Each structure stands twice: as structure tokens, then as C-alpha cells.
Design a protein with these regions (language model features):
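Positively charged n-region of N-terminal signal peptides that target proteins for export
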Residues: 1-7
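Bacterial N-terminal signal peptides
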Residues: 7-18
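Metal-dependent phosphoester/phosphodiester hydrolase catalytic core
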Residues: 22-451
């Protein structure tokens, strides 16, 4: 116990900002709806942080304060309520002599058929791919060139279990996190990148964790570091779980009548990866699985987008499967495998039986980009779009799980990527964009006849 406390104190001292050189305030807005949002801040000292916000160009500015303390790593959140739908808001956050400004847009009313644009990706700061001393995280400058409504940060927002250092890397990431101060330091390191800061101040961010926020391929109930990893994640993103379920991360939000997004937590409730697949094995847990099927089936939005940090059809994992797939490296489904395909297929069957149309899954994790059309039965199909990494080891496309009858429309490895989705009444267009900002592939799908 004494060694653990001493180590925690040392890490805290190493990563606390120096009093003589207070860093810029960190700000992110998330959980935006048509009438509300959550503003997250990190200050550089304990005490109040001032917030002013209002409709861009409007005559009125609301004022509020967020109290932060050392115990919370100087982080805090402020609910923004009674906002105007389909409006651009600007805000100013200040503490001491520091001040930063940002903006975001609110969603249109639920019945409005308003166009929407989003981007998604994941996997930031793996071994040998943390912040470059001169370039930082360059993909965020490419992201900033695309004017969108929000960013979906689809897991591996940090690599807590990777040490990254060297003369060409910004110091502060060369350790494996095991304590709450260390996990927070990992998040702070990524968020302090200048390009990340600027980008996160330009729009709203919806984030979800995957495995590296805690440890590679972890399963929540059986991992002793789940609680501290989850706490640090919640400390550093503008997420406000329900009061009666303070650990809950899965959620949904609607963007007009054309789009509803369902964000899954694929870690907190999962059975150990090493267990053979079977009726009792779960990635989502009973409550989240039922919520997902009922919410997607009950949605009246034209397009239903499900965010899964791990892919449906790409086999992953070392000694055991970590994604939904039970397929081997050649794409053939295997009996007695250790994936989660039975639960995946039960969810898809629930969607099909309840007439779900215009269904898209967004994923990351595998460090390559791919656009896939699945046709598991003759009368029903859906799409899976994968993007990434933001800055991590580069992967290559691999055989897909043939149990879903997939058709790869495009695949790209060996380069950092993100995906852009544009939804209009006429259809949905997806683009894969590389780190230079170049569009590598574009594909459009039209809405099916139903809702």
C-alpha cells in the first residue's frame, strides 16, 4: 500500500502543471441535443472557472461558473439548458488570466428533415505514435478542414497500457497507467495537443471508450482496473450518466428526422473474451442489449446509426476473439470460438424481425478503413463502416466474417484515416479521408422505402 501511494504521489507531481507556466484551458462540448448540451473544462488551478455562452450574433450571453479542485484534476462540467434548436452557439471560458473561446451547433427539432454531417474515427496515441514534437497529431488539422456538426470519437481515446517516448515525441506519455492520476495524465496528454484543442473547440464531441482506456482487450466485470479507467474517462469527457446509473456510458441522441445515433458500451458488461461463445456469453449485457433492440426498432428517424467500438465482421484478438466475430483469419466462422457472434446475430435478428431499415454501424479499432455491405439474409441488409486510426500503428484489411455474407465496397490500410457521413433527404454519403485531408473513396446509399 505504501509503495502504491508513493508512486501515485510521484506521478501526480510529475504531471501537474507548473505554477509558473499555466497551460491553456481545455474545453470540450458534448451530449448536444436540440435544447441542451454539456460543457467540459479543465482549469490550471483550483477555484472557479467562468463561462459565458450565447447564440452566435445574439444580444444575450448567459453566465455561469464551474468550481474545480485538485481532487477532480481541475476538471468540471456544466449543463447548458434551454438552448435554441438548430443554432450556432459561441462560448468563452476563463480562469485567472487565461481565456479560450469555442463554438458548437445544436440539433434541429426532431421532426425537421435537416441535413447533417458528422465525422468518426478512433485510436489515438498508441506505442510510438503519441504526439510528435513538431507535428503533434496532424490528422486533427485534416479533420478541421471538414465543416461538420459533430465528431464521434469511437474508442481508444488514449492508450493507457502503451508507453510512448523518444526524442521525436512530446514527453509525458512514456508509462503504463495503473492509478487514477496516471490514467488522467494519459487523457490530459492527448487533449493538450494544439490541433486536438483547436478542433474540439470548433464542434461537439461524443466519445465512447474501448479497451485501451483501461487495458488491451479487457472485459469490464473481470478487470480490476475498470473502475479507475472509467473514472478517468468520465473525468475527461462531457458525459453525464443518469443519476440512478452513474457508470452508464451507452446512450442515444437524435439529429432531426433524418438521423438517430446509438452509442454502445462494448466493454463494461462483457463476458471474459476467453469464454467459448454460447447463449450466456454477452458483450453488451442484458439491459443494454434490450435497450439497443428496442431503441433502434422504435426509432422514427430515417437513418439509424449504431456506434460500436469493435467491428461486427473483422476478427480481432490475440489468444481469444475481441470483436463480435467468431471467424478465423480466413473469414470462416468457427464452432466453439471465443467471439460474441451469437449475441451479434440475435441483435441483428431482432432488428430484422421488427422491420428496421436504413441501418448503419460505425466502428474503429482495427487500424484500417473499410466500407462493407452485409446481406445476412436474402431479404435484409445493412452497412458497416470502419475508419481509423487517428494516430496508432497502421493495420491492413483482412478477410471478413463470411457468416454475415459481406461485400467489401472499399478497404484501405497503411494510412491514418477518418470517415465523414453526410445525410440528406435523398440519401447518405460516406467518405474515407486520409491524414492529408484527401478523400480516398466516396459511396452513396439511398433510403429504403420504409422509415
Amino acid at each position: 500500500m505504501g509503495k502504491t501511494l508513493a508512486r501515485s504521489a510521484l506521478v501526480l507531481l510529475l504531471f501537474l502543471p507548473a505554477a509558473a507556466a499555466a497551460p491553456a484551458l481545455l474545453v470540450t462540448v458534448g451530449e448536444v441535443t436540440d435544447t441542451a448540451a454539456v460543457l467540459w473544462v479543465r482549469g490550471h488551478s483550483p477555484g472557479p472557472i467562468g463561462v459565458q455562452y450565447g447564440v452566435s450574433g445574439g444580444p444575450r450571453r448567459e453566465r455561469a461558473e464551474i468550481q474545480v479542485s485538485l481532487a477532480g484534476d481541475f476538471t468540471g462540467k456544466l449543463p447548458l439548458v434551454a438552448l435554441a434548436p438548430a443554432s450556432r452557439y459561441r462560448y468563452t471560458v476563463s480562469q485567472g488570466g487565461s481565456e479560450v473561446q469555442g463554438e458548437f451547433v445544436t440539433a434541429p427539432p426532431p421532426a425537421a428533415a435537416a441535413p447533417v454531417r458528422l465525422v468518426w474515427s478512433g485510436d489515438l496515441g498508441s506505442r510510438a505514435q503519441c504526439r510528435h514534437v513538431t507535428e503533434g497529431y496532424p490528422i486533427f488539422r485534416a479533420l478541421a478542414r471538414y465543416r461538420v456538426d459533430f465528431f464521434l470519437f469511437v474508442g481508444d481515446t488514449i492508450y493507457a497500457d502503451h508507453a510512448c517516448g523518444g526524442s521525436d515525441r512530446v514527453p509525458g506519455y512514456d508509462f503504463v497507467a495503473r492509478t487514477l492520476p496516471e490514467y488522467r495524465a494519459k487523457h490530459r496528454y492527448n487533449r493538450e495537443d494544439a490541433a486536438v484543442q483547436a478542433y474540439f473547440r470548433s464542434l461537439s464531441v461524443y466519445a465512447i471508450w474501448d479497451d485501451h482506456e483501461v487495458r488491451n482487450d479487457f472485459s469490464g466485470p473481470s478487470e480490476k482496473l475498470t473502475e479507475v479507467g472509467r473514472q478517468a474517462f468520465l473525468d475527461y469527457f462531457p458525459i453525464r450518466p443518469p443519476h440512478d446509473d452513474p457508470a452508464r456510458l451507452y446512450r442515444k441522441f437524435r439529429w432531426g428526422s433524418l438521423l438517430e445515433v446509438f452509442i454502445l458500451d462494448t466493454r463494461q458488461y462483457r463476458s471474459p473474451n476467453t469464454e467459448p461463445d454460447g447463449p450466456a456469453k454477452t458483450m453488451l449485457g442484458t439491459a443494454q442489449k434490450r435497450w439497443l433492440i428496442d431503441s433502434v426498432a422504435g426509432s422514427t428517424a430515417t437513418w439509424k446509426v449504431v456506434v460500436s467500438s469493435v467491428p461486427l465482421s473483422v476478427p480481432t484478438g490475440g489468444k481469444a476473439h475481441d470483436s463480435w466475430s467468431n471467424a478465423n483469419v480466413l473469414g470462416f466462422p468457427e464452432e466453439n470460438a471465443t467471439g460474441f457472434a451469437l449475441e451479434r446475430d440475435a441483435i441483428l435478428r431482432g432488428f430484422r424481425e421488427r422491420g428496421v431499415e436504413n441501418l448503419v454501424f460505425l466502428a474503429a479499432d482495427v487500424h484500417h478503413a473499410e466500407l462493407i455491405r452485409h446481406h445476412p439474409t436474402p431479404e435484409w441488409s445493412f452497412h458497416e463502416f470502419i475508419a481509423g486510426p487517428l494516430s496508432a500503428s497502421l493495420g491492413r484489411p483482412r478477410p471478413l466474417d463470411m457468416g454475415l455474407n459481406p461485400r467489401s465496397l472499399f478497404a484501405l490500410g497503411g494510412v491514418e484515416t477518418f470517415g465523414e457521413v453526410s445525410v440528406e433527404p435523398a440519401g447518405l454519403t460516406v467518405r474515407i479521408v486520409d491524414v492529408s485531408g484527401a478523400v480516398r473513396f466516396t459511396h452513396t446509399i439511398g433510403p429504403e422505402a420504409g422509415r
